[in-house]
Design a protein with these regions (language model features):
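N-terminal carbohydrate-binding accessory modules
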Residues: 1-50
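Substrate-binding cleft and catalytic face of glycoside hydrolase catalytic domains
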Residues: 18, 44-133
């Protein structure tokens, strides 16, 4: 059932990927096996009637350098959600930034994140719902 029907049954896939004070990154989608099983995970959504999903590609993977974007880890999952008719609530940045950026306190964060958000919107124009940060 599409969100514009007046009702949606939503869930989210935990996609935190913070860098700890030790410098070690903890990627929750990696830890729970989602990268290896995303097709199965998305199939389970459909099997229980979920029609909206808070989901986003890992910002640190898709924005590997200033003005450089790598959508290779995002394209197939995003397209599969679209094919399943699941409304994506795009989680653009969830508890972590690319290593080159340094952190949320970096004065350049808003500029680089804005660039990423623009590129995401151009790449996936069918996504209309967002949780930016």
């Amino acid at each position: 059932m599409p969100m514009d029907s007046g009702f949606f049954f939503a869930t989210g896939i935990e996609n935190s990927y913070p860098t700890l004070s030790t410098g070690r990154r903890i990627d929750q989608m990696d830890k729970c096996g989602h990268y290896a099983r995303w097709e199965e995970d998305f199939g389970l959504l459909s099997s229980i009637g979920v029609n909206a999903l808070r989901f986003g590609p890992a910002y640190y993977l898709t924005h590997p350098a200033p003005d450089r974007f790598d959508w290779s880890s995002a394209d197939a999952p995003m397209e599969r959600l679209r094919a399943l008719g699941v409304t994506v609530i795009a989680d653009l940045c969830h508890f972590g930034v690319p290593d080159w950026l340094g952190g949320f306190q970096d004065v350049a964060f808003p500029i680089h994140f804005g660039s990423y958000a623009r590129e995401f919107a151009l790449r996936y124009p069918w996504v209309r719902h967002f949780t930016p940060v």
